[in-house]
Amino acid sequence: MRASLKFLLFSFAVALLAVAPARTAGAGQQAAPPETKVDASNGGVTMSSGVNSLTIGARAQFRWTVDKREGFDADKLGSGVGISDGPLSQFDIPRLRIGLSGGAFRPWMKYSFQFDISRTAGESASKIKDAILEIRPTGKTYRIQAGQFKVPFSLQQITSSGRQQFVDRSITDSKFAPARDMGVVFSGTTTSRKVGYEAGVFNGAGESNRQTRESPLWVARVIVDPMGPYGLVEGSSDAGDKPVLHLGVAARGGAQIRGRTTAGVVQDADNQTAVDVEFAYKAPRFYSTAEAYWMTDERHNPVALPDLKSMGFHAQAGFMVVPRRAEVAIRFAQIEGDTSVDDAAVSEVRGAFGYYWRAHNLKVTADIGQVSYDAGFSSLSARARAGLPAPGTRLVTGQTLADTEFRVQFQLAF
């Protein structure tokens, strides 16, 4: 018995000695790290290694504007006081942005950061435009985004300023679209990508601003692309061989957008609700888009007044005179800041020409048009004028005014 036990112990010891070197050798062999790849073929730089990736991009817009405002006087001192100003010529760099995007640590973890070196808004002159953490499960059609990014309301607003058909967005944008805010969104599509949905909650305080009231901003959006996915790009410079149609509706409520809640009111602040209906159609040589908005502002705190109702729309269409190269377009937009006030609308009409070398990444756009104020515009309340083009100091009141503007913009993006 004792001999058998000794034999078993001896055999076990020999086995351990035999296995130990193999284990030690195996432990010393670490898996080779994934190959690191660098691609700069599209202007920007993309570095990737396994599930980790980083893309560095940038966008710059160089703009020249000539603006002639009817009956406008900007002089505060000197001989020009009381005399209508002539055309004002101005060179500007409205946007100069750097973007970082990619994935980290897990195949479902994505990120996107965007900084604007040009003028920005927000606390402490924040330069942050986007700061997004995205969870996108592999093989799924939904995602979760958190951070600061565009509220999913208004097709033209969520379409990048670098992918517009005109030099800039319509006058409806500032009035009805929340633009960027801090919050969280759950979104997804059907497997065919013909139906999509988004729902989210945001501060409502606007870009790079902390919460200023108790109740947040909520938003929901549903889209239908019956002819295939619609990309967020205006114009036909990127159009495929077949046309695509886009339809959508969005609703929001709660906080007033862009931090317009009355200063000092935190509890039971006035709410704001709005509905947006969106349309776009893109073909190889034709593009059209339109949106209509209806908005109601509650007015009970700090002063009780009837609710303020406003509405507006914009519509534009363009044609490629040279496929993928040269495009002409026209736009019309109108806003009633207070539907209970007659003859107080503000309107916009513009024509545009765009020339594309590398679609929207390298292009020049020129547009000319007028922003007109009806005779009763000056009678609107400050709340009704919020988000509308500011008329400034005028030498006349109670009559229709028209401001003419010519803009040329060169854009480089990669």
Task: List where the protein language model places each region.
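Outer-membrane beta-barrel pore domains
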Residues: 30-38, 69, 83-85, 135, ...
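Positively charged n-region of N-terminal signal peptides that target proteins for export
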Residues: 1-6
